[in-house]
């Protein structure tokens, strides 16, 4: 099974087993950062010379009472099956699966100039109405657009930027070649 298949399998299993998916989603995100951001911590948990029992003791000692039992047990399963390295990808896949279950769509919005919060909220509202889903917008500024915005989600791209409009005009002008010797007057 490839890495994305492993991640999807574990994420789906965890989502099916939990009664508090939003809490688990937050915990997985925090743990993925905690365990894989610091090189010493990452190396400890990925080291083949440290036993899984020792790794599990460290997790239990430091996390019991601070995260839900299901998340702690899940980490133990990942350790014992040699899958802890997949935690960051499992966390991402868990979020994808939870979003599907909740009818949410995460969209990347690039704009120039940067969207004001009210504009982003209005765009989210329009998208939600049009696509019958709750939209979570991840907004960033992109000066290469010259003006306007680009929205990307799933396999869809909505492009309303000056750069794309100029590209369309250029393409249109190049396609409409004038016949040799033709003279046009206004």
Curated annotation (Swiss-Prot):
Membrane topology (UniProt): Peripheral membrane protein
UniProt-recorded Gene Ontology molecular function terms: proton-transporting ATP synthase activity, rotational mechanism
UniProt-listed PANTHER family: ATP SYNTHASE DELTA CHAIN
Biological source species: Leptospira interrogans serogroup Icterohaemorrhagiae serovar copenhageni (strain Fiocruz L1-130)
Lineage: Bacteria, Pseudomonadati, Spirochaetota, Spirochaetia, Leptospirales
Domain of life: Bacteria
Protein name as annotated: ATP synthase subunit delta
Annotated keywords: ATP synthesis, Cell inner membrane, Cell membrane, CF(1), Hydrogen ion transport, Ion transport, Membrane, Transport
One CC-aspect GO term: proton-transporting ATP synthase complex
Function per UniProt: F(1)F(0) ATP synthase produces ATP from ADP in the presence of a proton or sodium gradient. F-type ATPases consist of two structural domains, F(1) containing the extramembraneous catalytic core and F(0) containing the membrane proton channel, linked together by a central stalk and a peripheral stalk. During catalysis, ATP synthesis in the catalytic domain of F(1) is coupled via a rotary mechanism of the central stalk subunits to proton translocation.
Localisation: Cell inner membrane
Family recorded in the similarity comment: Belongs to the ATPase delta chain family.
Keyword Cell inner membrane assigned: yes
Subunit note: F-type ATPases have 2 components, F(1) - the catalytic core - and F(0) - the membrane proton channel. F(1) has five subunits: alpha(3), beta(3), gamma(1), delta(1), epsilon(1). F(0) has three main subunits: a(1), b(2) and c(10-14). The alpha and beta chains form an alternating ring which encloses part of the gamma chain. F(1) is attached to F(0) by a central stalk formed by the gamma and epsilon chains, while a peripheral stalk is formed by the delta and b chains.
Main location per the UniProt record: membrane
């Amino acid at each position: 099974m490839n890495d994305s298949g492993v991640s999807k399998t574990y994420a789906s299993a965890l989502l099916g087993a939990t009664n508090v998916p939003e809490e688990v989603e937050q915990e997985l995100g925090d743990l993925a950062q905690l365990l894989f951001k610091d090189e010493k911590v990452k190396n400890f948990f990925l080291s083949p010379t440290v036993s899984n029992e020792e790794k599990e003791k460290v997790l239990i000692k430091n996390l019991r009472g601070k995260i839900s039992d299901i998340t702690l047990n899940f980490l133990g399963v990942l350790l014992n099956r040699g899958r802890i390295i997949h935690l960051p990808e499992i966390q991402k896949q868990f979020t994808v699966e939870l979003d599907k279950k909740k009818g949410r769509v995460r969209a990347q919005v690039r704009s120039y100039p940067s969207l004001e919060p009210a504009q982003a909220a209005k765009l989210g509202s329009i998208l939600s109405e049009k696509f019958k889903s709750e939209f979570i917008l991840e907004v960033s500024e992109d000066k290469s657009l010259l003006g306007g915005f680009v929205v990307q989600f799933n396999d869809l791209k909505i492009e309303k930027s000056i750069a794309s409009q100029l590209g369309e005009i250029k393409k249109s002008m190049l396609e409409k070649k004038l016949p040799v010797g033709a003279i046009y007057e206004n």
